[in-house]
Amino acid sequence: MTLNELDLYFRSFLKIEDYLMDVSKNGIQIQNSSPNGKQIKKVCFAVDACAETAEKAVQAGADVLFVHHGLFWPEIGTITDSVYKRISPFIKNDIALYACHIPLDANNPYGNNYGIAFRLNLKNLKPFGEWRGMLCGVKGELEKPLTVEELVEVAHSHNKNEKPLCVLPFGKKIIKTVGIISGGGAGEDDIRQAVEQNLDAYITGEAEHSSYHYIKESGINFIAMGHYYSETVGVQLVAKKLSEETDIQTEFIDVPTNL
């Protein structure tokens, strides 16, 4: 499989074209020397494209690095300083960079939010959480009602060493319904959607000081898993799918930010 064929493979289920309002340049961000000729033998997966993940991809012998947070956003201008440090390993080592942002948050069943929902064993799943006119989250009902503490434990069950960034138990003692928006979904407008839909708990990645009193006054349980940890889910699900359906080797590069 070549890089361009791999691009078509990812697009066949990640539905990148459905999220054109995304600020990320999704898809191939840095090509290799022969996108129609060079055979892809190994793809590494990571949450962030940065100097460290790029160097680790080089060390792992990767042909492609697939990330949730790529390098090309509207604010990227010149390739200098830290931007150069991030980009140069790809060019020097003929490694391609592939990014998938909001499509990977929203994807069912390979995205961050649905992946967390499956981990929680949520039922009756429905799209939830509008951003720029795009629904990128999910909501559902717990098969077995849980306390806040139990919900946190299950959410972090895949990595016992990763602790939640913030837990605000301001809602019902027994939780039956949950809304999920991974990553940076801690704004008041994000949380309001969970409140207005009468959800018992809201799970996201980050926590914002400015939302604290709104959460408390609205009487909802709020869990911030950590931006990084909440978005390790999708890249690993895509890696698993790729390894099961092709002969391409995969490897997850874990570079936690503890944020």
Model-derived regions, located:
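Active-site catalytic microenvironments in core metabolic enzymes, especially phosphate/sugar-handling
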Residues: M1-L259
